């Protein structure tokens, strides 16, 4: 069964408040989303495997630990998920980056795929899917299904804010995928937006309407 982890660190909550504020401009919004993604990465990677190695410090030889598990691929759901990639890459610079393009049909609210480019060894990697908002859950569930179709086995989803409805959709569709969020918000409104949410993350990241 999938696990939902809410990462309620004071720095994350402070920055999330600034992200939510409608008066925060695109430049600050981009920087804040990147910073929160980087902070969340500490918890997202908490269960990564380690191995012991021998090194030599300026003082003596000693044993220490390094990452030993699978290599990582970050897969943003376009376009808003792009805003979280650089923050995670700062901590895992060797990670590969795939892209999945989905947009939401404004009438049906269902996701439509328009782009998919993934590392060839996607099945051997730990996959971190990024999307600032988990609203209806349709895009995330479809993106994860597409990853599995391409061979991915080890997937975790990272979002800034999530609606309970979206969490349930992803958990029901993919009980093997853990979800990490900075905030679980109240609900979805009639238009499928998260309340209180942060508006349209893609538009706010890139200054579009």
UniProtKB/Swiss-Prot annotation:
- Known function: Catalyzes the conversion of uracil and 5-phospho-alpha-D-ribose 1-diphosphate (PRPP) to UMP and diphosphate.
Q: Which family does it belong to?
A: Belongs to the UPRTase family.
Binding locations of uracil: 194, 199-201
Which pathway does the protein contribute to? Pyrimidine metabolism; UMP biosynthesis via salvage pathway; UMP from uracil: step 1/1
Could you tell me the keywords of this UniProt record?
Answer: Allosteric enzyme, Glycosyltransferase, GTP-binding, Magnesium, Nucleotide-binding, Transferase
Q: Which domain of life is it from?
A: Bacteria
Q: List the disulfide bonds.
A: none
What is the name of this protein? Uracil phosphoribosyltransferase
EC class, as a word, reads transferase
Keyword Acyltransferase set for record: no
- Pfam families named among the record's database cross-references: UPRTase (PF14681)
Read off the SUPFAM superfamilies from this record: PRTase-like
Q: Where does 5-phospho-alpha-D-ribose 1-diphosphate bind?
A: 79, 104, 131-139, 200
Origin species: Clostridium tetani (strain Massachusetts / E88)
Catalytic activity, reaction form: UMP + diphosphate = 5-phospho-alpha-D-ribose 1-diphosphate + uracil
Q: Which cofactor does it need?
A: Mg(2+)
Give the Enzyme Commission number. Answer: 2.4.2.9
Q: How is the cofactor bound?
A: Binds 1 Mg(2+) ion per subunit. The magnesium is bound as Mg-PRPP.
Activity regulation, per record: Allosterically activated by GTP.
Biological process, per Gene Ontology:
UMP salvage; uracil salvage
GO terms for MF:
GTP binding; magnesium ion binding; uracil phosphoribosyltransferase activity
The organism's taxonomy opens as:
Bacteria, Bacillati, Bacillota, Clostridia, Eubacteriales
């Amino acid at each position: 069964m999938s696990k939902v982890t809410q990462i309620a660190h004071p720095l994350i909550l402070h920055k999330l408040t600034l992200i939510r504020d409608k008066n925060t401009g695109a430049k600050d919004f981009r920087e804040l989303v990147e910073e929160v993604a980087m902070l969340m990465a500490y918890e997202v990677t908490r269960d990564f495997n380690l191995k012991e190695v021998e090194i030599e410090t300026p003082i003596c030889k000693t044993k220490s630990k390094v990452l030993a598990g699978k290599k990582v691929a970050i897969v943003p759901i376009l376009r808003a998920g792009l805003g979280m990639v650089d923050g995670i890459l700062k901590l895992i610079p060797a990670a590969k980056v795939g892209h999945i393009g989905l947009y939401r049909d404004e009438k049906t609210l269902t996701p439509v795929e328009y782009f998919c480019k993934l590392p060839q060894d996607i099945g051997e990697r730990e996959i971190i899917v990024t999307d600032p908002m988990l609203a209806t859950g349709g895009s995330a569930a479809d993106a994860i299904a597409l990853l599995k179709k391409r061979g991915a086995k080890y997937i975790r989803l990272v979002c800034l804010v999530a609606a309970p409805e979206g969490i349930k959709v992803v958990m029901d569709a993919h009980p093997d995928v853990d979800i990490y969020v900075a905030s679980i918000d109240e609900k979805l409104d009639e238009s499928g937006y998260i309340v209180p949410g942060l508006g349209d993350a893609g538009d706010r990241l890139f200054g579009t309407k």
